[in-house]
Amino acid sequence: FYKIRDNFLQFWFRFIYPNRSYIESGNQSIVMSKLKKNFIDNHVSFVYEEICRQEIWNLADVWPYTFDKVGRWWDSRNNEIDVMATDAEGGNLLVGECKFWEGPVGINVLKSLEEKAEMVEWNKNNRHIWYVLFSINGFTSELEELANQRDDIVLRC
């Protein structure tokens, strides 16, 4: 499995290259239709997730530990966590979701993340789990209130 890290090249090979014949023949409407249909889910959301993972390094002073690795996690049953960071010395596990969608993120996303975090086997019997949620359109007041009550949740817009 390989991944092109340059977002412009990703865009080119995902949208331009497969549609060259339409573009060259002047059928821009077909290309634009495909772009509108797939641009957010098949390009922007992945770019946003990568930006969120990079942002974790900038948020290092938010948590009372320093993590060693930042990446993502998935298992054989297609469960996925957008952001995962570990602190091997202290047994801290940071998990996060990145939501690039219309509307605010609610408690349901946090609950789903909490369930997925329990599936992670890393240091399972001796760890502290921290949560971070990223959203381009904010959070519900219910989730903001819960985050204010708990020190293990960080919300970022």
Located regions from the model:
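Accessory nucleic acid-recognition modules appended to NTPase machines
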Residues: 1-80
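Conserved nucleotide-binding/hydrolysis micro-motifs of P-loop NTPases
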Residues: 9, 100-103, 137-140
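Conserved catalytic cores of phosphodiester-cleaving nucleases, focusing on short active-site segments
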Residues: 56, 81-85, 89-102, 113-115, ...
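Active-site-adjacent loop/helix micro-motif of nuclease/hydrolase catalytic cores
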Residues: 102-114, 141-143
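Short, basic/hydrophobic alpha-helical segments
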Residues: 111-125
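Domain-level recognition of nuclease-like catalytic cores that cleave nucleotide substrates
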Residues: 125-157
